[in-house]
Amino acid sequence: MTLMISTSVLDAENASRRDALTRDYESLGDRLARRGIDIDAVKAKVAAYGVAVPSWGVGTGGTRFARFPGPGEPRNIFDKLEDCAVIQQLTRATPAVSLHIPWDKVSDLGALKEKGSALGLSFDAMNSNTFSDAPGQAHSYKFGSLSHTDSATRRQAIEHNLECVEIGKALGSKALTVWVGDGSNFPGQSNFTRAFERYLDSMKAVYAALPDDWRIFTEHKMFEPAFYSTVVQDWGTNYLIAQELGPKAFCLVDLGHHAPNVNIEMIVARLIQFKKLGGFHFNDSKYGDDDLDTGSIDPYRLFLVFNELVDAETRAANGFDPAHMLDQSHNVTDPIESLMTSAMEVGRAYAQALIVDRKALAGYQEENDALMASETLKTAFRTDVEPILATARLENDGAIAPVAAYRASGYRARVAAERPAVAGGGGGIV
Amino acid sequence: MTLMISTSVLDAENASRRDALTRDYESLGDRLARRGIDIDAVKAKVAAYGVAVPSWGVGTGGTRFARFPGPGEPRNIFDKLEDCAVIQQLTRATPAVSLHIPWDKVSDLGALKEKGSALGLSFDAMNSNTFSDAPGQAHSYKFGSLSHTDSATRRQAIEHNLECVEIGKALGSKALTVWVGDGSNFPGQSNFTRAFERYLDSMKAVYAALPDDWRIFTEHKMFEPAFYSTVVQDWGTNYLIAQELGPKAFCLVDLGHHAPNVNIEMIVARLIQFKKLGGFHFNDSKYGDDDLDTGSIDPYRLFLVFNELVDAETRAANGFDPAHMLDQSHNVTDPIESLMTSAMEVGRAYAQALIVDRKALAGYQEENDALMASETLKTAFRTDVEPILATARLENDGAIAPVAAYRASGYRARVAAERPAVAGGGGGIV
Amino acid sequence: MTLMISTSVLDAENASRRDALTRDYESLGDRLARRGIDIDAVKAKVAAYGVAVPSWGVGTGGTRFARFPGPGEPRNIFDKLEDCAVIQQLTRATPAVSLHIPWDKVSDLGALKEKGSALGLSFDAMNSNTFSDAPGQAHSYKFGSLSHTDSATRRQAIEHNLECVEIGKALGSKALTVWVGDGSNFPGQSNFTRAFERYLDSMKAVYAALPDDWRIFTEHKMFEPAFYSTVVQDWGTNYLIAQELGPKAFCLVDLGHHAPNVNIEMIVARLIQFKKLGGFHFNDSKYGDDDLDTGSIDPYRLFLVFNELVDAETRAANGFDPAHMLDQSHNVTDPIESLMTSAMEVGRAYAQALIVDRKALAGYQEENDALMASETLKTAFRTDVEPILATARLENDGAIAPVAAYRASGYRARVAAERPAVAGGGGGIV
Amino acid sequence: MTLMISTSVLDAENASRRDALTRDYESLGDRLARRGIDIDAVKAKVAAYGVAVPSWGVGTGGTRFARFPGPGEPRNIFDKLEDCAVIQQLTRATPAVSLHIPWDKVSDLGALKEKGSALGLSFDAMNSNTFSDAPGQAHSYKFGSLSHTDSATRRQAIEHNLECVEIGKALGSKALTVWVGDGSNFPGQSNFTRAFERYLDSMKAVYAALPDDWRIFTEHKMFEPAFYSTVVQDWGTNYLIAQELGPKAFCLVDLGHHAPNVNIEMIVARLIQFKKLGGFHFNDSKYGDDDLDTGSIDPYRLFLVFNELVDAETRAANGFDPAHMLDQSHNVTDPIESLMTSAMEVGRAYAQALIVDRKALAGYQEENDALMASETLKTAFRTDVEPILATARLENDGAIAPVAAYRASGYRARVAAERPAVAGGGGGIV
């Protein structure tokens, strides 16, 4: 297997931190044992956990106002896979990559699959794109795609999704994620009902072509790029879609796609209860679909989402098998650093949720002891589980401190020298 | 039939406005005719339209900080019915009253029904109350009602709903509206899934006892009185309830119960499309469940909701038969004046939606002519339909200018003399 | 003066609508007279009113996901001025254009000024751009501009603003509008206090170079492009800036730059009261800085803003002289049509505010007659003032129905033939 | 000094936890030492820190829908002081109580002061109440108080504030907190400018009577009890007030009084920078002014607020001396437990902010290393500082685990037996 970061750098980095980590792990183990928790069992679960990385995440993102690229931007999916391999090597938490078509389209799928294998990466859910026009495309998506009033445009969008499935089959993917920007900017522009009927008809055509062992994930979003109405605007509509399509259809929850103040963990619980939670696009946000680094704004909210997931896992909820993926826009950081940190944040929330005293919690809930129920969650959240995460990484040949190891490796400077600088772009779209 | 306002006052008031109204109606008819619209047909529809008044709406509302009562507060449901009769006499748009149990509980239901008949009022949906404790109640709803962890408390809440149905049957009502405040104030306080399972079980027990010709309306609300999670928090959960319960179960939409920025008219469209729109609690809001007078904050939003309703009515959407009710808190106005004005605002939105050029709109939607689609709605909304509403009222023996007629009648001073002043209350709940 | 639309087309269009307009104007005059309002006086004020058009508004806008250009996109500021001239010719409500530097930078300012004169357009406030990197720029604005931690970058941003002033002086502009995207995406990324100190220092350098008869407008915005904190995030900070800078500094209010639910008309009132209202960027929004067409989402809110403006105008508030400009992103419409319609919407809100019965309103406010105060505003808002606007346009040689006249003229097809199609862009910025 | 909880109970509770605490404190000290932090120095600061408790907080709160009292509700301010003394005895973090007039009005101020002394409690800021009508009050606050259109009503509100100052002087308080509910429920109901002028005039009269060594805190709030506009709606208006009044006037920040998504820590920074931060009402919220327990919903936000406070403290910001108070509504918990837990949460955020590596942070900020700046804060936040807080309590004769000690003491059952049960109330205010 090709390793992007030299093991000598990594070993030296780990060596400098190993003793302190051992002490911290022991001390934490002692404290957890007092609470009846076996630290090694938690570590084993954390070590087995992974979150997929989006191929587009390793490039610098931007806004409609501007994009400010960083050095060494990946030029194509092969470069992107190498960056993803760095993330996986150091964190040991991101074994799969999620592709975006047509951005990651290649002529030789076999070469792509081989590259992934060589880097130890598999291919997660495929993502279609009918929210922008590819060069030379016959019909524009300016006024919609799967819900467009014109049947030829809808057909084109359906075909594109089918092509994504075909590519995914070649790469070993088992799921298709469909997010559309379809909607309207003016009251009256679109007939809500007819648009949704058209969307459902199109999705049924896609669904019909889905292999038996695949799942299809639909993703809701409140607004942007449409600013008055969006066809798949919330989890209610998303649930209706999954219900209309059938047993292979599930709802994808992106943490930044909801109205202000919405209780997202409750939506997660409802979708689990009705067997339609497909998975997540993890990120964080303060205002809208900010696509900030996971856990950087409201880490307790992330924990509360994982509290629902571990609750479902613990009681072996029927049909519970969500896919986990990061989906962020890295506008001001090195994308590799952001994705490593975010993957660790997801793992941290998982670890914290694992050490919730669920028996005590259930008792407090039954007795309506609101304060102690809250404290039970807070106690788990307050626990600094970093020694667990770091030990899991170390034992899996990753880094105790991935960002430090990455910086020590000089990887960014190396690829900056190899990959030519790209223009900024975005500045004329206001 | 007993008339609360003397016809001589009403006639005098109308006489002073009749000529101007005739001219305005003619001039508007001329303008509408140019757009291919028959003003008399619109007037006929408006004249036939009614919205129910909530019995509690004729008392002065308040907040957790204070309640500032006005003069002549109704002392009981009989007083309330008289106030409601004033509203109906002058607006001719509020033929039914919606009761709230136990607030409107009486020992003699026959007398109550008779009083309604004498005043020309029928009884709309019954409203149960399991969000506050009635004196002497065996089990408290402090920690929930239909979803409470304790089965005896749930049973009590179920029985209360069944009692509401019994009362409603005696009065000629055909629907039960269920809104619960159940939820939690702390993460962890409640297990979302188990609480919803308990809620559904309780509601199934209520549903099972529903007469064949009744409907049951469940009402979602984002927050308040619970401030972290609410069991029936949004239309997605509300839809699941209606689906789980069966064909007599429908979703009620209160305009003030959504997250900030949410597109409510789209939710209305979805519920119509999936045959689960039960009806409305009309009001307006700027921040939360402000319960302000309908149309006082965002009249265009109200129009857009009615645009969906008329769209469904026009295409005779399957299963479309929503109930219309006002639900407001009148903290700084004479409740009778607010309810009259709000009933007229609802009628206004309906009239404006009726004169939308739907054929042109459909064409613009098909061609993605967003600007002209928007202008088609705006043109209807901009039309001052007051002459239509006023003429419909006049021809139905109501008032051209209900507030002016009401003030001229001296009704408030009269009841202030008859009904003793009540204390303010509310001041200690912070 | 060069006319972009042939007068024969315009005359024919107007001829077909003139009789109906005359009747409608008379009928409206009759109704207004009954309320003690002289329709001709209102018309005169409306006719004298103008709103500036942003040069960038005549191009198609987009989002970070995609931009879908329309036919005949303007290639440069000369093309843009021609499009602006169409808007002014037909609406007679947009006599000035606001430029954006460097987007509208030219080598020959004299030619630009002459072109404006020939088209009957003057130059409104200059807009600087330090939120994106121009090709070849020495220092990047990736991490801020006027508040950047690096003094050379701040100096560059200051110089750019000074250059904008110089260009504006040559063109007859009298104001500089400064909006920066400076902020942060992570808690901790920026020290709020130091960043604001640096911003103020930079702005003081710009202010020092401002000609005596110029004003400087600073614009606040809650978020985007920065997603955790923004240096000039709200009107409170904006007020502090204007206060720190001095008497030529004022606050600019963009209707889409506030937190959800915020009462914008109240902010307008506060800024007027404290003599710091500089002007407006008009648009509409439902979720964030959606930059939708003015009045398309919440026309009553627009009216309430104008209600404050007319209130201040009526009482001749000290220091009250706001600048009016549209600032919208036209993603799915012909930008010329959107700007014409929006200019008319602004005029409509002004006309509606002019016919508010201010004496009655003051009385109701004094007596706390909330309902009648509200009805006083609603009565004005409900009045269809289109005949006033259309007559004002007609008498100023504009179009009774600008969009219809524009479509009849074939202008878009003509420029589409002359101006080569442009690429979409935007698709890689997610 | 009177101790409400017997020392034998407390000692037994502490004894059972002391060994584990010693180990945890040592282990944490070891980890902090590695980061260059002296745990004892942090502990000393935490031990010296206190937050005031609101007298009304020890009673059960409610909503406009209902209030569900708990057992042993305090009957008067003497009972309330005893409950507050429990909180202080166990947490050693709440040495002062903030009174609310007229709720806490007594005939014998000397007795009240003595009772406080006996319990080891001092008196923090006085709170006036002009948002509800006291029995027998001459003028109603239904339509406002300090901003009312009627001068006699304003005068009454001024006098009430002056009385609060007089009471406070007798008790040793040094500050007056003014929060008014003044505002409007309808567009047009209130003239924003005139209402604010009247408010300022009234406040100037209050300010004029303020003793030299007192401060006056004004508190802004977006909405509730007024639902369209609020006179002191945000920090911008609050700043204007403090500026207009003079050097003894400061702004109070309640964490739940802002628009959705607003960056509160930034407002705190601005007020510090402009020397007008008066202090805090701590609580937490998810939707509006939910008045939930501090740190229960978004603990990271609380930490970010304290990060600003410690930043200001570290650089000895000019004029920086904020008052700290809890302000919560305990609807579903034992108020004593909630207040103890919340006081500890405030201390926790303070301790976490104290261990931020500020030198490293400043370096990352200077270099725009957004990721490491964020990680620097997250590292401090992730540290479980409970051993520091618990040791500080223990060394101050408080409880290692205050809630457990309180439950063991049987205090609630004791007062429930002494204090008669109270009615629920609130149920009629909808």
Curated annotation (Swiss-Prot), chains A, B, C, D:
Its cofactor is Mn(2+). Keywords: Isomerase, Manganese, Metal-binding. Mn(2+) binds at residues 257, 289, 291. Its EC number is 5.3.1.-. InterPro entries: L-rhamnose_isomerase (IPR050337), L_rhamnose_iso (IPR013451), Xyl_isomerase-like_sf (IPR036237), Xyl_isomerase-like_TIM-brl (IPR013022). Pfam families: AP_endonuc_2. GO terms for molecular function: isomerase activity; metal ion binding. Belongs to the rhamnose isomerase family. This is Probable sugar isomerase R00627. The lineage of its organism: Bacteria, Pseudomonadati, Pseudomonadota, Alphaproteobacteria, Hyphomicrobiales.
